[in-house]
């Protein structure tokens, strides 16, 4: 494959779209200067750029080749990497795949390779953030629906969704990622992800503020003033999460 060219790839922002870009790169024996979702594209740079249509057949060929050539660990790593906020993540993933096709199943252990190191660290950050949201996400009751809003750096919603679906399988709920404009809807046992610029919240249930007040009282009561350590709290409960947490909202 040739060195990086000046051509830029634009795609629809989906994982299948990215895999279609990978197919195009190998088919044309070119390494693009950038791979960007079309909604992030600078319109002044579109001249001379390629818009890569999502081709499910081509995407599936690439998808099947990953575990076959690199192993399931590499497939899982790439799928998680797509949810990260890593700069130029598509190019870093393409670099990883080029290396993986070359060296095979040991690619994930080659941590001295920049492509592997960057993706591994990005996925670790994604997983740490997702883990924090398992404890920090707070629902509020709006009518018969539970609604929570999050503002993550990474696109953690697809990662944390199975946990909350399992935990609240008997409820109807929605989690809205304000950063990535993505909503998870769970109703009557069915799950759906929707892109949404914003959401119009229905009126809160009459009892909601009472529950919030009780939770804040409980949180403040169980704390031991003599053992208070604000630095330790900020370490384990980073301040950027507080504005969405019932017990911390008035402390922001």
Question: Which role fits each region the language model picked out?
Answer:
Residues 2-56:
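N-terminal ordered "arm"
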Residues 17-28, 94-102, 162-166, 212-220:
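Short, hydrophobic/amphipathic alpha-helical patches that form generic packing surfaces
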Residues 50-58, 190-203:
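Acidic, Ser/Thr-rich peripheral helices and adjacent loops at domain boundaries
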Residues 105-195:
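Internal, well-folded beta-alpha domain core
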């Amino acid at each position: 494959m040739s060195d990086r060219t000046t051509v830029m790839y634009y795609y629809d922002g989906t994982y299948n779209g990215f895999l279609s870009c990978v197919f195009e790169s190998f088919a044309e024996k070119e390494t693009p200067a950038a791979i960007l979702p079309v909604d992030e594209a600078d319109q002044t740079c579109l001249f001379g750029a390629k818009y890569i249509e999502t081709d499910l057949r081509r995407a599936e060929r690439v998808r099947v080749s990953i575990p076959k050539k690199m192993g399931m660990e590499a497939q899982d790593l790439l799928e998680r990497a797509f949810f990260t906020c890593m700069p130029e993540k598509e190019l870093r993933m393409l670099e990883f795949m080029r290396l993986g096709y070359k060296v095979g199943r040991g690619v994930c252990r080659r941590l001295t390779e920049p492509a592997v190191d960057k993706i591994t660290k990005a996925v670790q950050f994604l997983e740490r953030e997702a883990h924090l949201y398992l404890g920090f996400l707070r629902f509020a009751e709006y009518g018969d629906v539970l609604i929570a809003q999050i503002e993550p750096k990474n696109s953690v919603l697809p990662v944390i969704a199975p946990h909350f679906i399992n935990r609240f399988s008997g409820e109807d709920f929605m989690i809205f990622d304000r950063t990535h404009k993505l909503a998870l809807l769970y109703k009557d046992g069915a799950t759906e992800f929707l892109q949404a610029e914003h959401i119009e919240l229905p009126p809160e249930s009459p009892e909601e503020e009472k529950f919030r007040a009780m939770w804040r009282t409980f949180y403040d009561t169980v704390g031991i003033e003599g053992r208070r350590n604000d630095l330790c709290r900020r370490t384990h409960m980073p301040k950027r999460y507080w504005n969405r947490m019932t017990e911390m909202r008035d402390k922001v």
